[in-house]
Amino acid sequence: MKVLVTGATSGLGRNAVEFLCQKGISVRATGRNEAMGKLLEKMGAEFVPADLTELVSSQAKVMLAGIDTLWHCSSFTSPWGTQQAFDLANVRATRRLGEWAVAWGVRNFIHISSPSLYFDYHHHRDIKEDFRPHRFANEFARSKAASEEVINMLSQANPQTRFTILRPQSLFGPHDKVFIPRLAHMMHHYGSILLPHGGSALVDMTYYENAVHAMWLASQEACDKLPSGRVYNITNGEHRTLRSIVQKLIDELNIDCRIRSVPYPMLDMIARSMERLGRKSAKEPPLTHYGVSKLNFDFTLDITRAQEELGYQPVITLDEGIEKTAAWLRDHGKLPR
């Protein structure tokens, strides 16, 4: 088994490379951060620096030579950005990578998508994989849905390659550069966290190691009998209030911080004002309508299909994941001083 991991220099991809190296699996990693690439090489991975949005066939040939399994973790993930940027990174890059993977004989292609394509500014619990909103919440969600359509078309036209789509919800853990670090910065800098209705929303999260475990399961020969293009929700399997998650992080980081309850309409009004300023300055605002809304609405997933078909069960609990993440932040000097 030889695995190519895209988006390998941070987040999920970085954790995936570490997992595979520890298992003694031959790994080729790709990403844009060459400094991180050198660290991956020290771990035992082969690193090929590349920007998938600018990849050409000669680079793809080198990247995919000898690869039988591809974990496509690379994505432009943001609540803020242009349609062109999302299409380039999430749709076009996925299409070209998938076409090259088929051409070079990749047997398994695991595509990391997002449950953001479910979000519609309403409360939802135990969402199943076939749910679709009347319209997508933002350009990111639309682009991830479009990337799944690309995968579906490739799976129908190329039965020799098995495609699998995973939708992990709210990823977090070591090497995260977005969710937990931003939250920790706000806790330290402001001494309080503003949550709609005090954080009463019921949510799901996914520790990186659990998402990697799901990718590993989906790559096994036992799954070859499953339909190509199959989609699976992935979470920690623990519905929790947002407040309880934030409070657990506050406790583990030992930060003097309070959770303050604010009315959702007021926080949303502030976010919309910031968005208007952001459009004028072309900078991502500290708060967005989408970001604030994700804190307000119940949003949990049903992972029954992954449990029954992949044999997926989380290997790290939510509390363990928060504890491990807090320890990593402390040990690697990632906390504000």
UniProtKB/Swiss-Prot annotation:
Belongs to the NAD(P)-dependent epimerase/dehydratase family. This is Uncharacterized protein YbjS. It comes from Escherichia coli (strain K12). The gene is ybjS.
